[in-house]
């Protein structure tokens, strides 16, 4: 994971040095100052960028340079939580007591989702009934889609399909939605067939690089394009064209990353094995 993070963070550092980030001005035009304006609005330091890339994002969730890196801490440390649970409680009768205690401990953290995902994959008495109930799985599929689409920023949902949901549970809607959706997909052959089409397999292949790159493209090229073209074409048409261009550029850069950057992880691992 680290080599790709490092390469992209170096690109972000250079973009900041060159003054290519125009997200603050674009946020004013788009009316999204509350979320989009504050990213990368500081003087970059090569040393702090290295710290974030090499260990900060994995151990502490540091994401000053690349805002999306906060999830890597959850995935990295969360995996060790799952490994520990599997080693200590796998197949044992008392595991549900341990699961309940861990759930309470993690209740107000972002690790709750990855822990519940592990629990969902373990064996339990009535799991087979849930897996084989087609109607219930389609219902979970629909419910999962609904909750996964809850506005991620936690605001701007008034008057939408999600406006009826109490704000007090905002931190749990996506977790609940993902659990329902993934469980349903694992048990619905027709959905699996649809998601097995080449376009989805390709997006899965480039997903890691695409995730790390997309915000860089949006905050630099996307913001510049919006500010430059909007006075000529109007807001709506400019945003539509911008969406297409951002998507093409992001996918293209992700493909290059998959071919030439991500393999560095394998080479680094092989080198360490030889030592």
Positions of the model-derived regions?
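Alpha-helical transmembrane segments and terminal signal-anchor/GPI-anchor hydrophobic tails
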Residues: 109-202, 216
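C-terminal "closing" transmembrane helix and its immediate cytosolic amphipathic cap
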Residues: 7-11, 15, 117, 121-132, ...
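Hydrophobic, aromatic-rich alpha-helical transmembrane segments
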Residues: 64, 68, 164, 168, ...
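Membrane-interface helix-loop-helix regions
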Residues: 5-76, 80, 180
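Solvent-exposed interhelical
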Residues: 76-103, 123-134, 231-234
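Histidine-centered divalent metal-coordination motifs
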Residues: 208-214
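Alpha-helical transmembrane segments of multi-pass membrane proteins
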Residues: 1-8, 86
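Hydrophobic alpha-helical transmembrane segments
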Residues: 73, 97-100, 112, 176, ...
